[in-house]
Amino acid sequence: ILMIDDDMVFPQDIFERLYRHQVDVVAALAFTRNPPHLPVLYKQHEGWDPILRKAYSKMEWIVNYPKNKLVEVDAVGFGCVLIDMKVVRAITPPYCMTSSGTGEDIFFCVQAKQAGFKVFSDTSTVIGHLSNPMIIGQEQSEKYNDPKTMELLYGAYKKYGVYDVCLNSKAEAAVKNGSEQVEVLAK
């Protein structure tokens, strides 16, 4: 199954580019529409919360990724994804339902991984994401995201969560003003 969002710009040979890998799930590399235009790649992070005394699992952005490679990840955005039908047949419906605050793409990838399938991103196949007035791609992401800004932003995301950083003016100010502010706000 090839799924492509209606706000993506992709090459005419997108199917061939993804199909050549012959893997369970593979997505073209896309970036978020809104700044900071992060790559839509995720790694699952698991740990133990000593205060709540329970295990936790969450998806974290993969900010630094190998370029021009087929990269195994834990989840991808479904802006442009090719899924082998054996994956769909192996997963129990509902395929894309979640109440955890994550999107249907992450939910599906978690189910696929739990069923023993692998998820990949083809970072050599970069697609554009329509955003008024431009198309967001790797070039815009790299212009916007110098290494220090990415490190600060990623730290804020880890402390506040993606949704909170996008909507929380304190978190936004922390990212703009530097790492000391992020640390102060986190206390």
Task: Please place each PLM-identified region on the residue numbering.
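Short beta-strand-to-loop acidic/aromatic patch adjacent to the donor-nucleotide binding site
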Residues: 1-9
